[in-house]
């Protein structure tokens, strides 16, 4: 939010991306329920890795054999990061099923926490991400995945670094930035 309490352009675009991701999350929840509750955090990290690695492969090769584009992979990264944050927040709980409204509230809660992190970082760094290449942000997502894997291999212990939550939040935000950038690039191409 700006000083006058109106949302910034970034927040508006961010919420548009998240709204689309949540709608897909809700549909998959209707199809599969909360079967993802069985996944441990390292399994979710690996799912995020698969998505990010496919994006990088497509970026490097300039082609793909499977029809789904990178946009869908970024959406998957966002939803898997939110699922991981939900899982982390529910550590110790053996509850497997959630009512749709409760699950929606928990999803939104993790988004709001992560959006607050974005606001704080944008305050300090400006909107540097807007000048970054999508390929660079993809590399940063992959780096965060490898950091997360190392933390997981160390039983979640760090000496001076942030824990896995911060890495999931950063990956989520970079994936949102990539989708915003892709959308803006598509709009610019259509205007030409």
Predicted features along the sequence, with ranges:
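Intrinsically disordered, low-complexity regulatory regions
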Residues: 1-192
